[in-house]
Amino acid sequence: MSEFSRRSFLKTACISVGALYAGCNNPVSPKQDASAPKLPYCDVLVIGSGGAGLRAAVAARKANPNLSVVVATKMMPSRNATCMAEGGINGVTDFENGDSYKLHAYDTIKGGAYLCDQDAVEKFCEAAGKVIYEMDYLGTLFSRNEKTGGVAQRMMGGASKRRCNYAADKTGHILMHSCLDDAISNGVKFLMDHELLDIGVMDGKCEGVVIRDIQTGGIYPLLCKSLIIATGGYTRIFYNRTSTPFIATGDGVAAALRAGLGFEDPEMIQFHPTGVKNGGTLITEAARGEGGYLINNKGERFMQKYHEKAELAPRDVVARAMEIEIREGRGFGEGLGAYVLCDVRHLGKETIMKKLPKIRHTAMLFENVDLVDEPVPVRPTAHYSMGGVEVAQFDDMSTKIAGIFVGGEAGCISIHGANRLGGNSLTDAVVTGKLAGLGAANYAKGVANFTDGAKTHELAQQWQAKFKEVTSGGGSVNEMYALREELGKQNWDNMGIFRTQSKLDLLAKNLDEIEAKYKQIRVPNPNEVMNTAFTDYVELGNLILLSKCACLAAQKRLESRGAHTREDYPKRDDEKFLKHSIVTMNDKNELQLSYKDVVVTEFSLDGRKPQ
């Protein structure tokens, strides 16, 4: 980088940070007059600052610039799972190669093992093609096709055509900064270092949330006319081995469940085939999309015997194949340290440096391996939540509770079914995030006045009392962190890639014991300021709750479908289980399981391509 460009970069970065912090000044209660409520408030509140949250916030502001739109986030807006999505963003823009929106929908539905709601998928795939042009126009620095000058595309697992648009292997990072710049430019306000505790609902309508300022420790009600949940997934239930950030603890999903919304398909959790051996950080699918091989200890490209698309088979197929190789003695190492190899050396240094620079850095950082010279050890890692808050309709991402909307991985509409295709997650974030923002803005416009916030204020008082209870008395934070590690191990051992009834029954028993221990835990630090141990305590409670939901649904789904592989029920059973699992919580805080039918339109269940 030249001296001039470095200076320009730093200048731009400083301007962006300054603008962001300017957006943090007085973000709530934008006007004070006789009609304003006594409690803090904003018109549209977005929880979560990933791609979905920022797209939602911008869409709401553009739909109605008079609305006050606030994004609450546990960390800096740029610290999220969107930044970690490396491979690309799906969307059909090249129709000359035989691709179409319908073919994208077919691949998505087939890859999702037909648990996708087909009406939603068709709308999603049409919107996906259009959003690529929108993000390109916004200034997203995509890699370019050297022949046409258009956005460059690569193959991804389960795809019939090249439709994954990319920016080297940093697509999510680049996309995230485009969305953040757009949000700042459009007057979106930010509450950084704030965590969601609960959602207040009165008479079937959202009245606000209980939120905690991590910096000061203040726990208070925040009223809003409409709420957008964009908190991402819950794969941190596999705490010891996941590719997602530490903040991906399903806070929004857990709060929605307690507020009365359904948790749809919680058992459907994707294991990405290639996480680094130590910890599970992602080696992007772009490595295989560019032609990388998976190699066992015999030096064989083993994927060719499992699927016709070899390394580019759907993720659930590749993950299972890798685990089978390891279980049958053709892997390297032992136990949780076992692995196979991902080899891209044959691509050459120039291609690796141009198209895969980030994963080269990741391999060096976590495994001390240079991909130019040697393969990197990999093993499946918990990566994506197909399940999420039950969404009522795709067009505005609304829920059954008036005023609550959901965007991105936190929701389940169900676009991804039982297994998400690579490249569809970023598309999901930008498409459903925008729809949620438009829906929330439209709803807020029709709400004349804020409620008095009685329910939300009551919940805030309960959480204030909870803080005092948990942070007083004896105990040790080490007990809490040991319990968190145990939760991750139990989930991985018994609800991982291969599941059985006996394993799931054992997990249910162990989760009850973990929950009982959690209720006795104390975090002996009454200091309210930057008490991150209490933040970890809240997150652990959410992870335990969501683990129990996933286990319950997995116990009762007596089939194998997508990411849900039952060794004791190895076949897909459309007659009994072409249904979505819906977990709800009753007034006694007991979990209940019900089902609803999958929406089937023109795509047959036998794998035939549409005409």
Spans of features found by a protein language model:
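Glycine- and aromatic-enriched mobile tails/lids
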Residues: 33, 40, 51, 56-59, ...
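An anion/pyrophosphate-binding glycine-rich loop and adjacent beta-alpha core
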Residues: 255, 261-377, 439-445, 485
